[in-house]
Amino acid sequence: MTTLSCDLAIVGGGLAGGLIALALAEMRPALDVRLVEGGASIGGNHLWSFFTSDVGVGDQWIVEPLIGHRWPAHRVRFPAHERRIDVGYRTIVSTRLNAVVRERLRERAMTGCKALAANAHAVVLADGRRIEARGVIDTRGAGDLSLLECGWQKFVGHELELAAPHGGDTPTIMDATVAQIDGYRFAYTLPLSPTRMFVEDTCYSDTPGVDAAALGARIGAYAAGQGWTVKQVAREEAGALPVVLDGDFEAYWQSGGHNVAKAGMRAGLFHPTTGYSLPDAVRTAALIARQRDYSGTALCDLLHGVAKRTWEQRRFYRMLARMLFRAAEPQMRYKVLDRFYRLDPALVGRFYAGRSTIGDKMRILTGKPPVPIGRAFSAMLGRPA
Protein backbone atom coordinates (compact mmCIF):
# COMPACT_ATOMS: atom_id res chain seq x y z
CA MET A 1 0.00 0.00 0.00
CA THR A 2 1.36 3.42 -1.03
CA THR A 3 1.08 6.09 1.64
CA LEU A 4 1.04 9.81 0.86
CA SER A 5 1.60 12.43 3.55
CA CYS A 6 0.33 16.00 3.72
CA ASP A 7 -0.75 18.67 6.16
CA LEU A 8 -4.44 18.67 5.25
CA ALA A 9 -6.59 16.37 3.14
CA ILE A 10 -9.93 17.68 1.83
CA VAL A 11 -12.18 14.83 0.72
CA GLY A 12 -14.69 15.92 -1.90
CA GLY A 13 -13.97 18.38 -4.69
CA GLY A 14 -17.33 20.09 -4.94
CA LEU A 15 -18.05 23.70 -4.14
CA ALA A 16 -17.25 23.55 -0.42
CA GLY A 17 -14.05 21.56 -0.84
CA GLY A 18 -12.89 23.60 -3.82
CA LEU A 19 -13.37 26.91 -2.03
CA ILE A 20 -11.53 25.69 1.08
CA ALA A 21 -8.61 24.54 -1.09
CA LEU A 22 -8.45 27.87 -2.92
CA ALA A 23 -8.65 29.92 0.28
CA LEU A 24 -5.81 27.92 1.81
CA ALA A 25 -3.70 28.19 -1.35
CA GLU A 26 -4.02 31.97 -1.09
CA MET A 27 -3.67 32.45 2.68
CA ARG A 28 -1.55 29.43 3.67
CA PRO A 29 0.66 28.70 0.64
CA ALA A 30 3.18 26.75 2.75
CA LEU A 31 0.50 24.27 3.81
CA ASP A 32 0.55 20.98 1.86
CA VAL A 33 -3.13 20.52 0.95
CA ARG A 34 -4.53 17.60 -1.04
CA LEU A 35 -8.00 17.85 -2.58
CA VAL A 36 -9.39 14.37 -3.25
CA GLU A 37 -12.26 14.01 -5.73
CA GLY A 38 -13.76 10.80 -7.09
CA GLY A 39 -15.00 12.39 -10.30
CA ALA A 40 -13.04 13.46 -13.34
CA SER A 41 -13.16 17.17 -12.53
CA ILE A 42 -13.45 19.54 -9.61
CA GLY A 43 -16.99 20.87 -9.20
CA GLY A 44 -18.74 18.37 -11.45
CA ASN A 45 -21.36 19.82 -13.81
CA HIS A 46 -22.97 22.82 -12.14
CA LEU A 47 -23.72 26.51 -12.11
CA TRP A 48 -23.67 28.26 -8.74
CA SER A 49 -25.35 31.64 -8.67
CA PHE A 50 -25.52 34.14 -5.84
CA PHE A 51 -26.48 37.69 -4.96
CA THR A 52 -23.71 40.19 -4.28
CA SER A 53 -25.23 40.57 -0.81
CA ASP A 54 -24.58 36.86 -0.11
CA VAL A 55 -20.82 37.33 0.26
CA GLY A 56 -19.25 39.69 2.79
CA VAL A 57 -16.89 42.38 1.53
CA GLY A 58 -13.99 40.73 3.36
CA ASP A 59 -14.63 37.36 1.69
CA GLN A 60 -15.10 38.43 -1.92
CA TRP A 61 -11.50 37.55 -2.80
CA ILE A 62 -12.43 33.86 -2.52
CA VAL A 63 -15.07 33.90 -5.26
CA GLU A 64 -13.83 36.77 -7.42
CA PRO A 65 -11.49 34.65 -9.62
CA LEU A 66 -14.30 32.15 -10.25
CA ILE A 67 -17.10 34.43 -11.44
CA GLY A 68 -18.00 33.84 -15.07
CA HIS A 69 -21.09 36.03 -15.43
CA ARG A 70 -22.14 39.28 -13.74
CA TRP A 71 -25.36 41.28 -13.85
CA PRO A 72 -26.23 44.51 -12.01
CA ALA A 73 -29.78 43.40 -11.18
CA HIS A 74 -32.28 40.54 -11.33
CA ARG A 75 -36.04 40.11 -11.78
CA VAL A 76 -38.92 38.14 -10.30
CA ARG A 77 -42.32 37.53 -11.92
CA PHE A 78 -45.55 36.39 -10.28
CA PRO A 79 -49.11 36.31 -11.61
CA ALA A 80 -49.98 39.48 -9.67
CA HIS A 81 -46.73 41.45 -9.87
CA GLU A 82 -43.33 41.75 -11.50
CA ARG A 83 -40.27 43.43 -10.07
CA ARG A 84 -36.71 44.39 -10.97
CA ILE A 85 -34.37 44.29 -7.97
CA ASP A 86 -31.20 46.35 -8.29
CA VAL A 87 -28.98 43.93 -6.40
CA GLY A 88 -26.14 42.34 -8.36
CA TYR A 89 -26.22 38.70 -9.38
CA ARG A 90 -23.22 36.48 -10.12
CA THR A 91 -22.67 32.99 -11.55
CA ILE A 92 -19.79 30.56 -11.15
CA VAL A 93 -19.46 27.80 -13.76
CA SER A 94 -17.98 24.50 -12.55
CA THR A 95 -15.51 24.41 -15.45
CA ARG A 96 -14.01 27.65 -14.13
CA LEU A 97 -13.78 26.26 -10.59
CA ASN A 98 -12.04 23.19 -12.01
CA ALA A 99 -9.55 25.30 -13.99
CA VAL A 100 -8.67 27.64 -11.12
CA VAL A 101 -8.27 24.84 -8.57
CA ARG A 102 -6.02 22.89 -10.93
CA GLU A 103 -3.95 25.99 -11.63
CA ARG A 104 -3.43 26.68 -7.91
CA LEU A 105 -3.04 23.12 -6.60
CA ARG A 106 -1.56 21.40 -9.67
CA GLU A 107 -0.88 17.72 -8.85
CA ARG A 108 -2.33 18.16 -5.36
CA ALA A 109 -5.80 18.28 -6.94
CA MET A 110 -6.35 14.52 -7.06
CA THR A 111 -9.29 13.81 -9.36
CA GLY A 112 -10.45 10.31 -10.25
CA CYS A 113 -9.57 9.20 -6.72
CA LYS A 114 -12.54 7.72 -4.91
CA ALA A 115 -12.30 7.80 -1.12
CA LEU A 116 -13.55 4.67 0.63
CA ALA A 117 -13.12 5.95 4.17
CA ALA A 118 -11.93 9.00 6.06
CA ASN A 119 -11.13 9.75 9.67
CA ALA A 120 -9.51 12.67 11.49
CA HIS A 121 -6.02 11.85 10.20
CA ALA A 122 -6.28 9.56 7.17
CA VAL A 123 -8.10 8.85 3.92
CA VAL A 124 -8.23 5.43 2.26
CA LEU A 125 -8.60 5.48 -1.53
CA ALA A 126 -10.26 2.86 -3.73
CA ASP A 127 -7.00 2.26 -5.60
CA GLY A 128 -5.33 1.07 -2.38
CA ARG A 129 -3.42 4.23 -1.57
CA ARG A 130 -3.65 5.88 1.82
CA ILE A 131 -3.29 9.56 2.63
CA GLU A 132 -2.06 10.46 6.10
CA ALA A 133 -2.53 14.04 7.21
CA ARG A 134 -2.45 16.28 10.27
CA GLY A 135 -6.10 16.92 9.58
CA VAL A 136 -8.93 15.83 7.29
CA ILE A 137 -12.07 17.71 6.20
CA ASP A 138 -14.87 15.69 4.61
CA THR A 139 -16.98 17.65 2.10
CA ARG A 140 -18.45 14.73 0.11
CA GLY A 141 -22.00 16.04 -0.18
CA ALA A 142 -24.94 15.44 2.12
CA GLY A 143 -25.03 13.02 5.04
CA ASP A 144 -28.07 10.89 5.83
CA LEU A 145 -30.93 13.22 4.91
CA SER A 146 -33.49 10.74 6.25
CA LEU A 147 -32.52 12.07 9.68
CA LEU A 148 -33.98 15.45 8.69
CA GLU A 149 -37.55 16.26 7.75
CA CYS A 150 -37.22 17.69 4.26
CA GLY A 151 -39.11 19.11 1.37
CA TRP A 152 -37.21 19.43 -1.87
CA GLN A 153 -36.20 22.06 -4.37
CA LYS A 154 -35.73 19.92 -7.45
CA PHE A 155 -34.72 21.14 -10.87
CA VAL A 156 -33.55 20.46 -14.39
CA GLY A 157 -31.51 23.08 -16.21
CA HIS A 158 -30.70 23.37 -19.92
CA GLU A 159 -28.14 25.71 -21.42
CA LEU A 160 -29.77 26.64 -24.72
CA GLU A 161 -28.01 27.88 -27.84
CA LEU A 162 -30.60 29.92 -29.71
CA ALA A 163 -31.02 30.61 -33.41
CA ALA A 164 -31.34 34.37 -32.81
CA PRO A 165 -30.54 36.84 -30.02
CA HIS A 166 -32.97 36.56 -27.11
CA GLY A 167 -32.80 40.27 -26.28
CA GLY A 168 -32.55 39.76 -22.52
CA ASP A 169 -29.91 41.24 -20.26
CA THR A 170 -31.17 40.50 -16.74
CA PRO A 171 -31.58 37.17 -14.92
CA THR A 172 -35.09 36.19 -13.91
CA ILE A 173 -34.55 34.19 -10.76
CA MET A 174 -38.24 33.30 -10.35
CA ASP A 175 -40.89 33.34 -13.06
CA ALA A 176 -43.91 31.93 -11.27
CA THR A 177 -46.32 32.79 -14.07
CA VAL A 178 -45.86 29.20 -15.29
CA ALA A 179 -48.40 26.48 -14.44
CA GLN A 180 -48.12 25.42 -10.80
CA ILE A 181 -47.22 21.73 -11.00
CA ASP A 182 -45.75 19.56 -8.21
CA GLY A 183 -45.75 22.33 -5.61
CA TYR A 184 -44.35 25.82 -6.07
CA ARG A 185 -42.98 25.85 -9.61
CA PHE A 186 -41.01 28.56 -11.39
CA ALA A 187 -38.74 29.07 -14.37
CA TYR A 188 -35.27 30.51 -13.84
CA THR A 189 -33.32 32.15 -16.66
CA LEU A 190 -29.75 33.42 -17.00
CA PRO A 191 -28.72 35.29 -20.19
CA LEU A 192 -25.19 33.94 -20.66
CA SER A 193 -24.59 35.55 -24.07
CA PRO A 194 -26.76 37.25 -26.72
CA THR A 195 -27.71 33.83 -28.12
CA ARG A 196 -27.25 31.57 -25.09
CA MET A 197 -29.80 31.26 -22.29
CA PHE A 198 -29.71 28.97 -19.29
CA VAL A 199 -33.26 27.90 -18.40
CA GLU A 200 -34.13 25.91 -15.32
CA ASP A 201 -37.48 24.40 -14.36
CA THR A 202 -37.71 24.24 -10.57
CA CYS A 203 -40.31 22.91 -8.13
CA TYR A 204 -40.58 23.12 -4.34
CA SER A 205 -41.88 19.58 -4.11
CA ASP A 206 -42.79 17.07 -1.41
CA THR A 207 -40.70 14.38 -3.12
CA PRO A 208 -37.06 14.33 -4.32
CA GLY A 209 -37.51 12.35 -7.54
CA VAL A 210 -36.58 14.28 -10.68
CA ASP A 211 -38.29 13.38 -13.96
CA ALA A 212 -35.64 14.84 -16.26
CA ALA A 213 -37.63 14.16 -19.42
CA ALA A 214 -40.78 15.88 -18.13
CA LEU A 215 -38.93 18.91 -16.79
CA GLY A 216 -36.86 19.09 -19.96
CA ALA A 217 -40.07 19.17 -22.00
CA ARG A 218 -41.33 22.03 -19.84
CA ILE A 219 -38.11 23.92 -20.54
CA GLY A 220 -38.68 23.44 -24.27
CA ALA A 221 -42.25 24.70 -23.93
CA TYR A 222 -41.11 27.71 -21.91
CA ALA A 223 -38.48 28.60 -24.51
CA ALA A 224 -41.07 28.35 -27.27
CA GLY A 225 -43.40 30.55 -25.26
CA GLN A 226 -40.71 33.23 -25.13
CA GLY A 227 -40.39 33.07 -28.92
CA TRP A 228 -36.97 31.42 -28.83
CA THR A 229 -35.87 28.86 -31.43
CA VAL A 230 -33.46 26.38 -29.87
CA LYS A 231 -30.52 25.30 -32.05
CA GLN A 232 -29.12 22.91 -29.47
CA VAL A 233 -28.99 22.07 -25.78
CA ALA A 234 -25.35 22.76 -24.98
CA ARG A 235 -25.41 21.44 -21.42
CA GLU A 236 -27.82 19.85 -18.95
CA GLU A 237 -27.90 19.52 -15.19
CA ALA A 238 -30.38 18.21 -12.65
CA GLY A 239 -30.67 17.89 -8.91
CA ALA A 240 -32.74 18.03 -5.74
CA LEU A 241 -31.77 20.27 -2.83
CA PRO A 242 -33.12 19.57 0.66
CA VAL A 243 -35.38 22.19 2.22
CA VAL A 244 -35.22 21.46 5.94
CA LEU A 245 -38.36 21.62 8.06
CA ASP A 246 -36.98 19.97 11.20
CA GLY A 247 -34.60 17.26 12.32
CA ASP A 248 -31.85 16.04 14.63
CA PHE A 249 -28.67 17.99 13.94
CA GLU A 250 -26.35 15.79 16.02
CA ALA A 251 -27.57 12.60 14.38
CA TYR A 252 -27.15 14.20 10.96
CA TRP A 253 -23.61 15.38 11.77
CA GLN A 254 -22.58 11.94 13.01
CA SER A 255 -24.08 10.27 9.92
CA GLY A 256 -21.34 11.87 7.84
CA GLY A 257 -18.56 10.29 9.90
CA HIS A 258 -17.52 10.12 13.55
CA ASN A 259 -14.82 12.45 14.89
CA VAL A 260 -13.97 13.91 11.50
CA ALA A 261 -14.29 17.54 10.45
CA LYS A 262 -17.01 18.24 7.90
CA ALA A 263 -18.00 21.20 5.74
CA GLY A 264 -20.62 22.07 3.15
CA MET A 265 -23.78 19.99 2.83
CA ARG A 266 -22.20 17.21 4.88
CA ALA A 267 -22.00 19.58 7.86
CA GLY A 268 -25.56 20.83 7.37
CA LEU A 269 -24.16 24.18 6.25
CA PHE A 270 -26.84 25.19 3.78
CA HIS A 271 -29.85 27.48 3.95
CA PRO A 272 -32.84 25.53 5.33
CA THR A 273 -35.42 27.35 3.20
CA THR A 274 -33.59 27.58 -0.12
CA GLY A 275 -31.18 24.65 0.02
CA TYR A 276 -28.39 26.93 -1.23
CA SER A 277 -24.93 26.41 0.23
CA LEU A 278 -22.65 28.97 -1.44
CA PRO A 279 -22.82 31.72 1.24
CA ASP A 280 -21.97 29.18 3.96
CA ALA A 281 -19.25 27.61 1.81
CA VAL A 282 -17.55 30.98 1.35
CA ARG A 283 -17.74 31.82 5.06
CA THR A 284 -16.40 28.38 5.99
CA ALA A 285 -13.48 28.65 3.56
CA ALA A 286 -12.54 32.06 4.97
CA LEU A 287 -12.76 30.75 8.53
CA ILE A 288 -10.54 27.74 7.83
CA ALA A 289 -7.97 29.89 6.05
CA ARG A 290 -7.65 32.03 9.20
CA GLN A 291 -6.85 29.07 11.47
CA ARG A 292 -3.44 28.11 12.84
CA ASP A 293 -4.17 24.61 14.08
CA TYR A 294 -4.98 22.16 11.28
CA SER A 295 -5.00 19.02 13.37
CA GLY A 296 -7.95 16.72 12.87
CA THR A 297 -9.27 17.27 16.39
CA ALA A 298 -9.05 21.06 16.20
CA LEU A 299 -10.78 21.16 12.82
CA CYS A 300 -13.54 18.82 13.96
CA ASP A 301 -14.19 20.88 17.08
CA LEU A 302 -14.15 24.12 15.08
CA LEU A 303 -16.49 23.01 12.30
CA HIS A 304 -18.86 21.08 14.55
CA GLY A 305 -19.20 24.20 16.68
CA VAL A 306 -19.88 26.39 13.66
CA ALA A 307 -22.41 23.96 12.19
CA LYS A 308 -24.25 23.48 15.49
CA ARG A 309 -24.50 27.22 16.17
CA THR A 310 -25.69 27.80 12.62
CA TRP A 311 -28.37 25.12 12.99
CA GLU A 312 -29.60 26.67 16.23
CA GLN A 313 -29.63 30.18 14.75
CA ARG A 314 -31.73 29.05 11.78
CA ARG A 315 -34.86 27.89 13.58
CA PHE A 316 -36.73 30.75 11.92
CA TYR A 317 -35.87 29.52 8.42
CA ARG A 318 -36.99 25.99 9.26
CA MET A 319 -40.25 27.41 10.56
CA LEU A 320 -40.76 29.24 7.26
CA ALA A 321 -40.05 26.01 5.39
CA ARG A 322 -42.75 24.31 7.46
CA MET A 323 -45.18 27.09 6.61
CA LEU A 324 -44.41 26.69 2.91
CA PHE A 325 -44.77 22.91 2.86
CA ARG A 326 -47.35 22.27 5.58
CA ALA A 327 -49.57 25.35 5.65
CA ALA A 328 -49.90 26.09 1.93
CA GLU A 329 -51.64 23.81 -0.55
CA PRO A 330 -49.05 22.75 -3.16
CA GLN A 331 -50.61 24.72 -6.02
CA MET A 332 -50.89 27.83 -3.79
CA ARG A 333 -47.33 27.86 -2.43
CA TYR A 334 -46.36 30.54 -4.92
CA LYS A 335 -48.41 33.06 -2.91
CA VAL A 336 -45.94 32.79 -0.02
CA LEU A 337 -43.09 33.84 -2.32
CA ASP A 338 -45.24 36.46 -4.06
CA ARG A 339 -45.79 38.20 -0.72
CA PHE A 340 -42.13 37.80 0.30
CA TYR A 341 -40.87 39.46 -2.88
CA ARG A 342 -42.93 42.57 -2.19
CA LEU A 343 -40.74 43.29 0.84
CA ASP A 344 -37.67 45.53 1.02
CA PRO A 345 -34.83 44.23 -1.22
CA ALA A 346 -32.32 44.62 1.62
CA LEU A 347 -34.46 42.32 3.78
CA VAL A 348 -34.66 39.81 0.93
CA GLY A 349 -30.87 39.94 0.56
CA ARG A 350 -30.26 39.29 4.25
CA PHE A 351 -32.72 36.39 4.10
CA TYR A 352 -30.83 34.65 1.29
CA ALA A 353 -27.51 35.26 3.03
CA GLY A 354 -28.92 33.63 6.19
CA ARG A 355 -28.48 36.85 8.17
CA SER A 356 -32.01 38.06 8.84
CA THR A 357 -32.32 40.52 11.72
CA ILE A 358 -35.00 40.37 14.41
CA GLY A 359 -36.71 43.24 12.61
CA ASP A 360 -36.59 41.29 9.34
CA LYS A 361 -38.21 38.28 10.97
CA MET A 362 -40.97 40.40 12.47
CA ARG A 363 -41.60 42.06 9.10
CA ILE A 364 -41.80 38.71 7.29
CA LEU A 365 -44.42 37.48 9.76
CA THR A 366 -46.37 40.74 10.03
CA GLY A 367 -49.80 40.94 8.42
CA LYS A 368 -52.23 38.35 7.21
CA PRO A 369 -50.35 35.23 6.09
CA PRO A 370 -50.89 34.11 2.47
CA VAL A 371 -51.97 30.70 3.84
CA PRO A 372 -54.84 29.61 6.15
CA ILE A 373 -54.15 31.10 9.60
CA GLY A 374 -54.80 27.90 11.53
CA ARG A 375 -52.44 25.92 9.33
CA ALA A 376 -49.85 28.71 9.57
CA PHE A 377 -49.86 28.57 13.39
CA SER A 378 -49.64 24.79 13.37
CA ALA A 379 -46.63 24.96 11.05
CA MET A 380 -44.96 27.63 13.19
CA LEU A 381 -45.34 25.42 16.26
CA GLY A 382 -44.05 22.36 14.43
CA ARG A 383 -47.36 20.52 14.55
CA PRO A 384 -48.89 18.59 11.64
CA ALA A 385 -51.26 20.83 9.65
Where are these regions (language model features)?
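C-terminal helical "tail/cap" subdomain of flavin- and related membrane-associated enzymes
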Residues: 286-385
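Flavin-binding catalytic cores
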Residues: 208-238, 261, 282-307
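N-terminal FAD cofactor-binding segment of flavoenzymes
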Residues: 23-27, 31-80, 156
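N-terminal Rossmann-like FAD-binding beta1-loop-alpha1 element of flavoenzymes
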Residues: 2-35
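Short FAD-binding loop at a beta-strand-to-alpha-helix junction that anchors the flavin cofactor
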Residues: 189, 195, 255-273
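FAD-binding beta-loop-beta segment adjacent to the flavin cofactor pocket
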Residues: 181-184, 240-262, 312, 316, ...
